[in-house]
Every structure is written in structure tokens, then in C-alpha cells.
Amino acid sequence: MKGKKDGLNKQVHIYSIDTSAFYNDQENKLHNKILKSYRYRDHLRKLEHVDKKHKKYITQRIISLKEKLYNAFNDHNQIRTLRTDSLKDNNVISLFDSVLTRTLGIKENSLSEEIMVVQTYHFQILRDIIDKGFIHNNEKYVYFTSSAGQIRTKKSCFIKQSTLDKYQNALTCGLSVEHINAQGGSSINKWNSYMALSNSASSSWEIDIDKAIVVNDLETNVSSLVDYIDRDTYEITRKIMDIPIEHTDGCGMMLPSLSQKSFMVRLPWVKGLLVPFDFRKFAEKHSSFIVKDVYGKEWDIIKDDIQIIFTKSQFKMWKYYDSWDDYRYKFKKYGCLGAKLNEEDPSVEGKLTYQMLQTLTDITDEELKQISSKTVSEITQLGTDKETMMKVLGATEKNKHKTSLQEALLIYPELLNDDHTKEIIKNKKKSMIKDAKSGKLLVSDARYTYLCPDLYAFCERLFLGIESPKGLLSGSDVHCSLYDEGYIDILRSPHLFREHGVRWNKKNEEYEKWFITPGVYTSIHDPISKLLQFDNDGDKALIISDELIVNIAKRNMADIVPLYYEMSVAQKQEINSRNIYEALTLAYGINIGEYSNNITKIWNSDNINLDVIKWLCMENNFTIDFAKTLFMPTRPDHVDEKIKDYIKNKVPHFFINAKDKEEHSVESINESTVNKLDSIIPSDRINFAAVAGKFDYRFLLKNKEIKLNEAVINEYKRLDRNKKWLMNDEEAKPGQKLYVYKIIKQKLLEIHNDDGFITDVLVKHLYKKKSKYKSTLWECFGDIVLENIKHNLKTFKGCCICGKAFKPTSNKAKYCQSCGKKKERDKYKKYNKKRINHR
């Protein structure tokens, strides 16, 4: 999809700083003294013989300095000022294009100071800047939002007050904090996450808001056998219960004329998945065209030309608007923007993870070898099989976000024989072995696809008013057009309890007519959403049709039913600086990974207790919601004792590969399912074979006679050495190093303002000396190298013998001049020898 590709190719750059950037001079002096003391303490630790009094002195000095620093924080009562010396190149991060960057008009590839990210190390300073804001360049900045991802890393987003004043209505569709507070406030962390919707990496979506409505969700009671956990006593009771399930939780519909593919959407206060479903055809079939929106107003979907139906679960702040017309009017008045993201792409190959594998506890060695065979084959073929090498390098037509190097490999595969490409493959192989030993296994025909509800059942409720709709899918059947009729295993991450949704994939013409996407559609009579813990706002499932895995999953799911317990409701509060600060500090204290790791300890132990895992799964979900609900169940003493007894061990041995743990911090290897992979996955060194024609670097040059330029080469070496310092952001993803390479490119162009010249100089320098490390060249000038290759392939050919570029005199020409002459001489010698022998 062009829009998606454009959205994920565009980036802007902003500063990401930490709370030390707001120190006053006294605090900064104390901070530097503490750092100096830490360095001295580290120096003492390296010495063999140190007088105890030195250790005692430095420890007490650090404690004393910290106390002085905290006192200085408390003494500071003015608005804080950003220290300009903190705005360094290594504090720049890259953001993908989003509603926020588009609304603010931040130009692509520019460095903007409209917004800044602040990471918290000292809570007193966070409290100050949330309460009073901060000053930079005579502009006041105020707290804007913190997304779920930012909360996990104690980060917050701040915005220029003048910018917020200008664009606030466009970002909030005219819904002010004052208006929310006048109606009783909101859950702070929910409000935070809804404000952060504008931050999502996305592409622009031209939505006609007048052709959209919002209706009530489809909720029904589903009768099911469950393990009911009493959240007060922790007692687990297996019984049949009527479970309320909101089948359309986060999901809406659009006419297929708008899009044949599902995608996620973002509008102010609106998020979720839109699935193409022809609700007009449904209305015409039943001659019923009137639907009610969430406010009770009736709409004729034909006369009103309704093309999109959102659900109440998608419209997060619907209660704060007077009507849907109120929202539509403000959306247009303030120039609000729509966005689309994650358009479905089932071509992405799926992989099993350790969480999915570890719950298959009775798997045999032979079965595990079979399941691992595709991964083992790919690892062993790396270096000798061209297709495998191209695939792991991402040089495939399926890859929609190809880099210049990946594009170049597709048109000039001889690059596979270059040392730089070989180095990438070597590192890729190490990574593949590590991944495989930690449970990431390739499975034939495994695909990721969206989880979709039975929208036919939704229309039966919406258009026909049927309280207990039947829908198209009956029982626990599912429909996914990617697979033939038969059993499939539906999986979702995180996978904590035994959560293999083995279901019958039903195929018929009626399903194909209504369910037009490759998503997996689930029945409204099936509690599968409780088993797999999903909603339908864009959650993806991994679908596996492999018969062996499906049968193993079936075997392990015998006697497993969904877990059920009553969750708490989010608490409303007034949105103000004090409550925002308190909500953030609560959220910062949550460690969801701890529960996941403790559950993994039990699955990989020699004594698996399902009840303990059930309790931990429940606690995990309460922990996730804690920042919103402020409720956490209290363990009874006997339960606490039992849980602690089971989680006292270290994490499993495979965490050396899965989480980079040291040998001393993991358990000894045992016979658990994932640990067994250690002996199945090969770790032998890579051996390269010539898999394509001979490589000639001159195909990468525009000017074949280019002379080396020492000034350019020396500056390149200096910048290449220093790029690690520039790439300071621990979270920066491979696609987010753009700013660093932008700086390097600018510095090189200051020496010689001709990027074609610089590219040729660097290509000749790096490829002639057979450097293994050419990433900076490809990141900075890869587009020019790619154009050079394209041009040269039209003009030159690679000699079939030596690989060198030559200008062919005819289409049949295969050899360069010297090899051609040698070939002719050899041919003549052979002919003469044959003639003499014949005589």
C-alpha cells in the first residue's frame, strides 16, 4: 500500500533528553560531583588492594552528595529552564510521520523543537515540569502525553505552549480538559493513552466524517465451561458460566468500496480496526436500512450515504460529546486529521515463540526435531544457497520497505559475494541461531492476520434488532481464507497460560461472499477471546496449519478451559498536574515482565503447577490495569507461600539466548521443551560459496576513472568512528538512525558539495580495500549507488569469466576484451590439438 509505505518512510527528528537537562547551576554542580565520585568508586573496585577507609569514604560521600542534590531539588521553586548544553546531536531521536507531526506541520527530515521527549531519572524534577512546565528559548513547554510505550521507559512528551494553543482543538476535536473535568473527569492513564493516539506512526487517511456513524457494540452472554478464579479468595472453580463478551471490542466496519483490506485507524479519541464488510448488501437483503447511533439518533444508511460504522468501544470519549453531529461539526471546524496504519499483509511469515512452545510440555524429541527442521535448514543453507541469503537479507519482492542495499541486491545479486554483505549474513546467522535456541522457529505457511468478529452477527443485531443473533459461524468454527478446510492453531502473544486455540477452519461460498479479507473470523458462540485474551482493535493472531503442531496442541489443550475472573473498572479523576504526576509514577512502578518471567520459570521447571500459573495470569492482568483502576487483589497467605515456592528459582537456561542473561543468572539446562532446542539447533560456523556471478565494484561507480580524495576519506573515517556516540538512544530502531546519517552526509558535503563525487570516492576507497564495514556508505549514499548500478546495468555487462564490467559490442557478447581474447586463443589451441590428433 502506497500510503503505508510513504508513512513509514517519512521521519522527523526531535530532542529526547532526561530530567538532568533541567538542573539549575547548583544541582548541576552536585550532579557532576556525584558522577566524579562514581568514577572514583569504579576505579577502586578494579584495584586488588584497597584500604577499607577509602571505600567507606567514597560510599559516604556519594550518599551525602545525593542528599544535598535532593534537598536542592526541594529548594527549587521557580519554573525550570532547559539547559541548552543538553541539546546535543546524540540526544536526537527520529519519529515516523504521525497525526501529531502532520498537524503541527513539522517538515519531513527536519529537526523540530515543537515537541520534546523527557525521560525521568528524578521524580522531583518530573513533578516540577508537569506542574509548572519549563522554559526554552523564551518559550514555555507543557506536558502533552505519555504513550504506553513511553510509560514503560519512563518517558513523557512535552509540547510548546504556543503550539498547543494553536493546534489543541485539531488534536482533541474541540474537547478541552476543562470540559472533561466539568463532566467528572477521566481515568488519567486512559486520557493519556487517548491523547497519545496522535503519536502513532501512520499515513494520512482522507475520511469523509459525514459518511461515518458510531453505534453500540455487539455484546452477548456466551455459555462456557471456565475456570472461575475468585479474586478475593483465589479459589479456582470449574463451572459453566454465562460470560459477557463484547465481540466487536475495538472493531468497526467499512464498505468494501472504500478498501478491500482491513486496517487500523486513528482519529481524535477514536482508535481500532476497520474491516471491510458490505453492510449495505446486508441491509438490502433484509430490506432494513435504519440504524441507531450511540446517542439514539436514527440514520438511513442509504439516504445518509453511510460508508463507515464505528463502534462505541472505538470512540473512547463519546460520553463527553452531546451527539455524533457535535463531534462531526467540531472535526470539520478544527481541521482534524484521520490516519490509517498497519494495513493487513498476511504475506509476513510467522514464527513460533518460546511462550507458545513452552506450553507444549509433552512434546517428544522427534516431534521437536520435525518442528525445528525448517529453521535448521535455513541456518545450514545460509552462505551456500542464493535464495536463502536473499531472503534473510530482506532482498525480496515481498519486502515493501526495502533499503537501497536490498534493492541493489535484487538487480545485482553479485553483491552477495562482497565482504560487506557476507559480514551482514554472518551476523544474521548468529542472530538466527540465537533466536532459534530461544524458541523462534519458522513454520511452513504460518501467517499473521487480524482477528475479526462475525460481522454478519453484528449486522443481525444492528439492522434487525435480534438480541441473540446466530451469525454465519456456528459453534467454535472459524473462517480464514488463507487456509483449506481443517484444523488450525490460532495463537496470540503474549501467551501465558495454555492458549492454543485449535479450531475447525470452515470454508463455504457464503463465508467467502461476506468475509472478504484474509483475517481469521471467530464465532460469537465461542469464548475464544477469553481463551486467547484478545480484543478486536487490531490484535493479530499467528495461524498455524501444520498438522504435526496442530495435533500436539490438541493433545496439550485437553482439559484446558478459559480462565475467568471479574476485573475492576477504571477510576475517574480530575485531570490536573498533581493527578497526572501521581498516575505516571504509579504506572512507572508496574513491571509486567516480572509476571511473564515467573510464569516461564514454572513452565520450564520439573514440577509444573497449573493453578499457580492461573493465579499469576490473573495477577498479570490486574497489574496491567492497575494504573487505571488502582485495584490489585491481595494474595491469601497460603497462596502467597505456594506462589513464592514455585517462582524462587532462576529463569530458565534458554534465557541466555532469549534475554541475554549471563550463565550464573539462569538455571542449569533441563529437558523442558525450549531448553531441548539447544542441542537441536546447529551452531557451526558459516561457509560461503560463490552463489552469484563474480562481483565487480565498478558497477557501483558513476565515474570509473574517479581519483581518491584524502580529505573526504579522512572525514568519513572520523565520522564513521564517532557514529556510535551519536546513536545514543537505546530504543532507536534500525529505521530510526536517519538523523545520524543525515549529519554524516551533511559533514561530508561540506568538504565537497557533490554527492555523486563523494559516493564514487567512498565506493572506490571501501570496495578496493575490501572493507567488511560499509553500512554508513549505504545509509548515507545508498540511493546514489543504486542509481549508478541501474545505469551501469543498462550500459555494461559483467564478464562471465572475471566478472568485470565491460561495454558489450552486441547483445550476444559475454566476455570482456581480455577474457574474450583468451577464450579465442584457448578455442584455437583446442582446435589445433584436435586436428593434429585426427591426423
Curated annotation (Swiss-Prot):
Catalytic activity, reaction form: RNA(n) + a ribonucleoside 5'-triphosphate = RNA(n+1) + diphosphate
Consequence of gene disruption: No longer forms lytic phage.
Cellular component GO terms, alphabetical: DNA-directed RNA polymerase complex
Induction behaviour: No expression under phage non-inducing conditions; induced by mitomycin C (at protein level).
Keywords: DNA-directed RNA polymerase, Magnesium, Manganese, Metal-binding, Nucleotidyltransferase, Transcription, Transferase
Binding site for Mg(2+): D535, D537, D539
Domain of life assignment: Bacteria
GO MF term list: DNA-directed RNA polymerase activity; metal ion binding
Cofactor: Mg(2+); Mn(2+)
Family statement drawn from the similarity comment of this UniProt entry: Belongs to the YRH RNA polymerase family.
Purpose of the protein: A single subunit DNA-dependent RNA polymerase (RNAP) that catalyzes the transcription of DNA into RNA using the four ribonucleoside triphosphates (rNTPs) as substrates. The enzyme is more highly processive than the multisubunit RNAP from E.coli but is considerably more error-prone. It has no detectable proof-reading function but can perform pyrophosphorolysis. Transcribes the late genes of the SPbeta prophage starting from yonK (approximately 35 genes are encoded in the prophage downstream from yonK).
Additional comment: Encoded by the SPbeta prophage.
Protein name (Swiss-Prot/TrEMBL): DNA-directed RNA polymerase YonO
Lineage: Bacteria, Bacillati, Bacillota, Bacilli, Bacillales
